[in-house]
């Protein structure tokens, strides 16, 4: 068994788990050791929230889904939050991983649609003609130029953030707006949220949304 490859620490709401993927040969080896390590105190994890910090670039969508399946079905946890080790160091877009989060590491092209009841994080661009629907937040580590709807289940606290925020249609809960066709295009990350019943767009300040 790989020593110190998985560190488990308790908190008020559940567990903080730090996984060093550099110490594993592959995902399957990591998952086997993870299950063995947590099985010792399995009964204590029911209904808790688990925060997993690791090198998310080492995971594909299928592996993230399998990981979530193990946590929710085998350990009966209430919530799972994935954090990238780089994000915790750089404080970029932290504070948005609240609740179940789905990661997509690809560019979304015209005609493609993503729909997920939790948060969506896209590492890539969202091209014109594509659509993104999330019950929670939508975060794009790239250019957002397609249609995007956060808080689709009515969550007015949801946010939409991107390195370049220029969607054709932007909607949070039941409030919709369109990006202006003219005007300067900011070179910094922006976040859209609801304030006083309207959608506002402002520079992304990490400490404000942590």
Swiss-Prot record:
Disulfide bonds: none
Keyword Secreted included in the entry's annotation: no
One GO term of the biological process aspect: division septum assembly
Pfam families: MinC_C, MinC_N_1
Keywords: Cell cycle, Cell division, Septation
Highest taxon listed in the record's lineage: Bacteria
Family to which this protein belongs: Belongs to the MinC family.
Record note on quaternary structure: Interacts with MinD and FtsZ.
Protein function: Cell division inhibitor that blocks the formation of polar Z ring septums. Rapidly oscillates between the poles of the cell to destabilize FtsZ filaments that have formed before they mature into polar Z rings. Prevents FtsZ polymerization.
UniProt-recorded name of the protein: Probable septum site-determining protein MinC
Gene field: minC
